[in-house]
């Protein structure tokens, strides 16, 4: 276990990216409980909210202490913590925390009362989801070195099971009170084994028998889904400790009654951001300059709560400053991601044998567009992990998939998992969203109607838009952009919010020029962007003073803030300046403010480097909901009334 987990690979698992985990590890901010509204917004917007709001009841927890209970107020005894669910957005450090937890145990630094730790990543369990297994057989497949152990040892020893990446699961978990399992050798399909009990250690149960019997043997065969469910509920190996990690939107798959402790990884706080850059960048002067730049660019600064984004930023900024100390440094998310993509393409060019510039350009375009198509199609399906069949759907020959991952080593990764099956993913969800946005804009530029119509027909359960209507025959850019705004407003959990920011950013002419080697041509987008930003500003401000309460609450606070950040992504500062002037003025009661406008004002106050002298909520002409949304601004005010 020590050999497996002592090294951290930032980006793809290539030797040049290898770093000793103990050297670079920066303690993450893990709290007990969860931040307010964690399931109601896009993951990145959750980080925006975390950056603005501190909860006095937050209890920081070190990852090695997640099973250690704190005494409750008024009670000296500590309750037993058996099952922990840790939530956190993509790239926030869930898997690295698991890695550190195991490494410290293997090195004898923590949790020495534990005899065995077993890591069962859902991305690997997916590959055997249709198979029948006993727990004993499953553990042998994952850890062949256990071959000589008696299966009874699992019941006699202290065991920790770690289920990493519930959000990546394609397995149906079953939590029926009528089905119970408690033997580690009972064989079952992944889903069924979890919920049934059997008393014979060698019994093989069919699904039908499984539903009506109890299971208590680790050698009995069940479905993988049932097996996992039974471990989580404690019906199988009730003394085992369970740690489950998940992105927030998927965490509700497990009934709360089976969870003893809920934790949330909130990523880096302010000192930890700086610590990360100083650990990673050996040149102290360069590290200070990069930290200073990120602090000035607020959207970049907030995103650096996410460790993966810190890595992308340090990669880009180190490269730019190494080539030219006076280089213009990216100010927006889209600019940062474009530069990261260009760095990877240049690395590929240095390795590639082709010397003909035109052939090299064509090859780069084909590779990136293929990967971008995968990103777009899978984003529309809500997938972050892909298998061979998903790649074939986008026209990528699976025999070439390793070539693709080798070409853009930090963008698209291939991993061998159980039974040496391959799984594929982008380095981070946000990079998938960036490439998906690029692909949609690229399709617009080359007049490829199919992806445009596929996007138009995309809808969530909440979406009232007519999915039969195609985009305008002429496909004007403003039609595409305003359609994207509407789609993002109705997408579940804000899953298109960051995609929208990237789509607007990519369409900006200055960014088109950066991408000119990948686009067949650029187009004049200034008027389309002007019309789209006007549409966004009208939506934020609201038009009707007499709007009813339901209309007033149509845009959530997080959606309103994302729309505001979309304006900054295309470098439209007009609303930002208008709000700054409004807040400083004495004219708060002259104009009615929509709830969305109040969310944006609150966000601006909180993001300001300089605290507001006084915030008097009663002076604002708004609804009760609007006033409620202004309350969060008091965190950056010297006086509140």
Regions found by a protein language model. Give the residues of each.
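Intracellular innate-immune signaling modules
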Residues: 1-641
